[in-house]
Design a protein with these regions (language model features):
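Substrate-binding cleft of secreted/luminal carbohydrate-active enzymes
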Residues: 183-209, 224-304
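Active-site neighborhood of glycoside hydrolase catalytic domains
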Residues: 72-82, 86-172, 176-226
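Active-site-adjacent "subsite" loops/lids of carbohydrate-active enzymes
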Residues: 2-5, 11, 17, 27-87, ...
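Proline-enriched interdomain boundary motifs that mark the N-terminal boundary
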Residues: 307-316
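Beta-strand-rich modules
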Residues: 369-399
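Conserved aromatic anchor
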Residues: 322-336
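Aromatic-lined substrate-binding rim segments of carbohydrate-active enzymes
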Residues: 1-31, 119-146
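Extracellular low-complexity, O-glycosylation-prone stalks/linkers
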Residues: 334-357
């Protein structure tokens, strides 16, 4: 820690490159305030910010946190985010649920001196929320100043507020909530357009007596303010002895079936990826063969940009028997960079606009933004097909369809 690797390599650059090679997006996941995970056990370099600016930090439990009420500490975090967006081609900045820390029974977060210095006329609860609001606004602004295409997302704890505290809250009985305990007013951030998506951590099961998956799923679907929602699934729980319902092979499939009843819920995120190494409950096979059997495009965010890339350029189209071969190049005109191409396959003679939004029609997603050569079969097992290609821009907006049978001159 505190020293560059020898021989030098950049882990973040490596991760982004390998992610993009696979047609995936890279969302840089950050904890906004947590600075030292376990006091006495975490190895901290001499030049670490906690050593250089100890007055910026507060000790709570066995962890050290940036003081959310310290403006210099806030600016440091904002500058880190700005640096990432400026120097690396990330697709999004993603904040974890740790804003003010989860409460420890019998211990008050030690920010009384910071509150007194602030001179705020707000009560301490509202002052804490205003501190978190301030850093969210500043991070959002910094991201968009550096690159308007980079998104800003939050992965909040499952409950914004319980209904017994606020009629806008969810039908839940969470012991701690975003608004009242972590001082994270997620709904405000969505409403004010400070963030682009939320990934609520719905890590408990269907029918839970206090925080039921199905109730929170419906609540978040109604409170997105037009932004994207990706549901967080707690698949790690299959390995917990006390999580009996997560040992049921039907739990995750049932969650996905419920999720897909809400058109404004765009997808899922799983915590954590290492759980899939064990193929829990056979879910790897179930997901691959049933729920995710077709390729999918990341949904575009219209409030960022609706601009389409120009259509791809096809050349050297040739037919030999039932095989058609051709070359694809990125468009030579237009201001929208291309990240990939999509090849669609339709039954010959079918009206394509009725099928374009069905993932089963995606033949392949080709992550070669500089172009590629391709050969396709126009007839297989007696069925005839027609192919079309689109270019996909950085905000996941597709170009117009180009039929493969037509040669588009450069």
């Amino acid at each position: 820690q505190g020293k560059a690797p020898v021989p030098f390599w950049d882990p973040l650059a490596f991760m982004i490159e390998e992610t993009h090679k696979r047609g995936m997006e890279f969302h840089a996941w950050l904890n906004p305030y947590r600075a030292v995970h376990t006091i006495g056990k975490s190895s901290i370099a001499a030049e670490h910010i906690t050593k250089r600016k100890p007055e910026w930090f507060l000790l709570y439990g066995d962890k050290k946190y940036f003081d959310p009420g310290n403006k210099d500490a806030q600016q440091f975090v904002v500058n880190v985010v700005r640096d990432i967006v400026k120097r690396y081609p990330v697709d999004a900045i993603h904040m974890d649920d740790y804003f003010y820390p989860y409460r420890i029974a019998g211990k008050e977060f030690p920010d009384a001196a910071s509150y007194a210095r602030s001179g705020s006329t707000l009560n301490k609860e509202d002052w804490r929320r205003s501190n978190v609001d301030s850093i969210i606004v500043a991070i959002s602004k910094a991201i968009k100043e550096e690159n308007k295409q980079v998104r800003f997302g939050i992965s909040p704890f499952s409950v914004w507020r319980n209904q017994d505290k606020d009629p806008r809250g969810s039908d839940s009985r969470a012991g701690q909530t975003n608004y009242d305990d972590l001082y994270a007013d997620i709904l405000l951030w969505l409403e004010k357009d400070w963030i682009d998506y939320v990934t609520p951590q719905l890590y408990l099961e269907i029918g839970h007596d206090k925080i039921a998956y199905e109730k929170l799923l419906e609540w978040w679907s109604k409170n997105a303010f037009g932004k994207h929602i990706y549901i967080g699934h707690g698949i790690y729980r299959f390995d917990e002895r006390t999580s009996v319902k997560w040992k049921n092979p039907a739990e995750l499939p049932n969650q996905l079936k419920l999720l897909r009843q809400y058109p404004n819920v765009q997808g899922s995120i799983y915590f954590s990826s290492k759980s899939f190494d064990k193929n829990p409950n056979g879910w790897n096979d179930s997901l691959q063969n049933n729920y995710y059997k077709y390729p999918a495009l990341v949904p575009s965010m219209d409030w960022i940009s609706k601009e389409k890339p120009a259509a791809p350029v096809l050349s050297r189209v040739a037919k030999k028997g039932e095989e058609i071969s051709f070359s694809v190049k990125p468009p030579s005109a237009g201001n929208v960079p291309v990240k990939c191409f999509v090849i669609y396959r339709f039954p010959a003679g079918r009206f394509i606009t009725t099928l374009i939004n069905q993932p089963a029609t995606i033949f392949s997603i080709v992550v070669k933004p500089n172009g590629f050569d391709q050969a396709l079969q126009q007839r297989e097992k007696g069925d005839a097909y027609q192919y079309y290609i689109t270019a996909v821009g950085m905000n996941n907006v597709e170009s117009d369809l180009v039929p493969v049978t037509t040669v588009v001159k450069e």
